[in-house]
Amino acid sequence: VIEPYELLEVNGYAVTALPATHGTRHPVVYIIEKDGKTIFSCHDSGYPKPPVLEWLGKCGKKFDLVSYDCTHGDMDPVEQWGENASHMGLKRNIILRDKLREFGLYKPGTVDIVTHFSHNGPKVGYDDITRLAKEHGFIAAYDGMTVEI
């Protein structure tokens, strides 16, 4: 069992779970590290709560890739439903990316990906998401996508 904020070694990967904002009992998102590369997988979650942001601000990691939840397309679910919104959209992804950069967690060339799309918001068609993502420096994920970092 992985506990929030604790590093666990899993088959050569260093995995740190962080509490997610989601409607399930103990949701988590992950920081995954291997061979000098670091990924922050923060999808299937809403915007991180203050304790998670505080931890991120002090963790000293440098992300090669960040995968963002974009369930709500071009909508900001925090504006719509409040801070307990269990998913994000592109507007909230931009806010989180700016915060991660402010914390110094980005390297030159960090890859930003949006994923976990659904019908729950405006402009959620893949063509819309791809265009909007590109306009803001994100890559829209697709089935079978691979990324070299």
Regions found by a protein language model. Name each.
Residues 1-58, 145-149:
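Core dinuclear metal-dependent hydrolase active-site scaffold
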Residues 49-145:
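Cap/insert and terminal regions of metallo-dependent hydrolase folds
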